[in-house]
Structures are given as C-alpha cells and as structure tokens.
C-alpha cells in the first residue's frame, strides 16, 4: 500500500535533448510530470547545475614586472585590472587534479588571446579566440597562470595563499561549467488529463561539458543527496515466469482507451459504446465503429492512426479476449505497455 505513494505518480515517458548543433547550448524537455513537479524538479536542477558541478578555472596570475592588480604595463592598452577581468573569462577543461601551470609570452604589436597560452597535456582552452589584452609596437608581456579544479564560485580573497610570492595576483574563480540555466513550466496532455506539467530547461555551458551530461550529473547529485532520507528497503517485485507465459496476447491490449491521446469527441463515443480496453477496440470493424452514434469518419481516422502507431488495427481477432481476470492482468502488465 505504501508503495503507491511513489509508484502511482506519473513519470515522463520521454526526455528530449536538443543540442541546437552546439556543444555549449542545449534544451531539455521532460513530459508529462505530475502537477507541481515541473517547478519542484526545475528549480532543484537549476540550483544544482549552477552551484555543484565541478570544473576548472584560473585561480591566480603572475605578470612579469607587475606587483599588484592596480598597475599598468607599458605598451599594453588594458590596465592590469582589465586584464584580470579578461582572464576570469577563459574557459578551461582539465583532466585530473590541480594545480597546474600555464604560460603565455608574446611581443607586440598584436592581440593576446587565450589561444596563445601554452598548456600542458591535460589542460585545454575552450575559447581560444577570447581576448586577454592588446599590445602596441615594441611591447612585450609574459604571464603565468595557476589553474585548479573546484565547484561553484570562489572569490579572489579565498585564492590568496598566505605564502604567496609578491606579484602573484589572485583571481575570482568561476569553476562551474554551467553558465546559465532557465526553465519554464507549461501544461501538457496525457490521455484525457490536460493539466500535467511539461518542464523545459535551457542550459548554456562553457563547452567543457554538454548540456545533456550536465543535467545527468545534476540529477545524480540530487539522487545521492535524497537517498539518505529513505529509511526503508523496498521489496523487489518480480512477476513469476509462469504468470508471464500465461498471457496469450499483446499486453498493450490491456491498456485502457482513455489513456490514448484521443479527442474528447472520440473518447466519449468509445465510452458510450462501452469500449474500455484497446483489446475491445481492435476487434471492432470500421463498419461497426461508423454505426456508433456521433462517431464519424474523422474520429475513425484518428483512432486508426493511433492504433497504427502501436502496430495494431481495427478488425483484429483475439481468441482469448476478454480474459476473466482482466483487471488484475492490467495491473500486472502495466509496465509493459
């Protein structure tokens, strides 16, 4: 009895991942959800996506000839404060643990980009076109970056080590690979119920992880955190093999017709004709259906299309139909249709 608290809640029968041809943008659509669960899951996933996924970021930079972030560099158009702001936007993917070192050394004139940085084997720059600073004729700059892994946002003050050498400038670190997350909740239909939730998540990452993987990681984090609150063991329910073998027809025939996505008119006609299960419906011929009051050619075509999507059609013969224990069988095989 207690299992009905979660077993009888409707779950999404599909989750669509739309990449828009980009590694950094994705849309995730899940439907149907119980009313209210779109907001519950959408908000929880958004918070975890933005705060709890691990990534890599620059934690500090040392620039030759510069003692602090309020300096300026001869021949460099940006001051050090602007350079540090640009460094914060470098997108990095790093395998393994840190910290790691990266170096850039360039002479002017020209633009210094993230692609000019010399990296070690397990560190990759994901936005090489990102501009760090601009050099005039005769200018030269050398910078050494410290890169580490972490999660969430860490301010520069927390990246300042007590034994840091003079000239090492700490940087605000945004470790999260997820840059933006938004979601919206819409009504969706399942059978004759029109007010289930449809959850749409829009995700933007820095490219170190895809939107689909980011959602999977966030869901796994939530699953792990919530599991501690489950204080019981759920008994495993396995259908005996002999019970499965006794069924002489497609289990889909045990599905009720009011669970099909039919128009209200078609559904009412079936109800008035005492057609409860799909097994009842497919044994009807087209001529018999057209003799049903208020049932026209449009409703007939609609039903034929729905049945065809299930590999069924009108006028089928089911010798073992209806079974004596049809309601018990419908409950037993509900996971198979």
Swiss-Prot record:
Q: Which GO terms describe its molecular function?
A: DNA binding; DNA-directed RNA polymerase activity; protein dimerization activity
- Listed as disulfide-bonded, the cysteine pairs are none
Give any Pfam family that matches. Answer: RNA_pol_A_bac
Listed EC numbers: 2.7.7.6
Cited InterPro entries:
DNA-dir_RNA_pol_insert, DNA-dir_RNA_pol_RpoA/D/Rpb3, DNA-dir_RpoA, RBP11-like, RNAP_asu_C, RNApol_insert_sf
According to the UniProt record, where is the region Alpha N-terminal domain (alpha-NTD)? 1-233
Among the entry's GO cellular component annotations, what is one? DNA-directed RNA polymerase complex
Residue numbers spanned by region Alpha C-terminal domain (alpha-CTD): 249-337
Q: Which reaction does it catalyse?
A: RNA(n) + a ribonucleoside 5'-triphosphate = RNA(n+1) + diphosphate
Q: Which domain of life is it from?
A: Bacteria
Among its keywords, does the record have Ribonucleoprotein? no
Q: Name one GO biological process term.
A: DNA-templated transcription
Q: What UniProt keywords apply to this chain's record, in alphabetical order?
A: DNA-directed RNA polymerase, Nucleotidyltransferase, Transcription, Transferase
Q: Which HAMAP family match?
A: RNApol_bact_RpoA
What the protein does comes down to: DNA-dependent RNA polymerase catalyzes the transcription of DNA into RNA using the four ribonucleoside triphosphates as substrates.
NCBIfam families linked to this entry:
PRK05182.1-2, PRK05182.2-5, rpoA
The record's similarity note reads:
Belongs to the RNA polymerase alpha chain family.
Fill in the subunit field for this protein: Homodimer. The RNAP catalytic core consists of 2 alpha, 1 beta, 1 beta' and 1 omega subunit. When a sigma factor is associated with the core the holoenzyme is formed, which can initiate transcription.
Free-text note regarding domains: The N-terminal domain is essential for RNAP assembly and basal transcription, whereas the C-terminal domain is involved in interaction with transcriptional regulators and with upstream promoter elements.
Q: What is this protein called?
A: DNA-directed RNA polymerase subunit alpha
